[in-house]
């Protein structure tokens, strides 16, 4: 059996909200993450779907500090030039917006319906 669970914390550097053709809400985030002070910023893409996306659209703003829990996913496609492309991202199951003015305490943890069923 294999294990696929990711927990990451970072600052939101980009946020895009859209609806799919069948009216599902999707929130795409890019988090800026640093391991240490003098290490370059790593950009990590995070995707929120459905009810989690609805909550994320309301609660998450650019420059918010988040803790995200989810699974690592990979998109694969062929571009116009015929080259195979891949992209890794985190499909979020939970997130918590941290209030840095209160010492990094979280407001509340928001989780997907699938995550609630597993508990």
Model-predicted regions and their roles:
Residues 1-4, 16-23, 39, 83, ...:
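Acidic, gly/ser/pro-rich intrinsically disordered tails
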Residues 2-3, 55-56, 62:
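Short, conserved secondary-structure segments in the cores of folded domains
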Residues 3, 7, 26-28, 41-43, ...:
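Short coil/loop residues immediately preceding or within conserved phosphate-binding loops
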Residues 6-14, 31, 62-74, 92-95:
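OB-fold and OB-like beta-barrel modules that bind single-stranded nucleic acids
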Residues 18-34, 86:
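Short aromatic-glycine-enriched beta-strand elements
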Residues 35-59:
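A beta-strand/beta-hairpin structural motif
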Residues 44, 48-50, 87-94:
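Hydrophobic alpha-helical segments of small multi-pass membrane proteins
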Residues 75-80:
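Short, Lys/Arg- and Gly-enriched loop/turn segments at beta-strand edges
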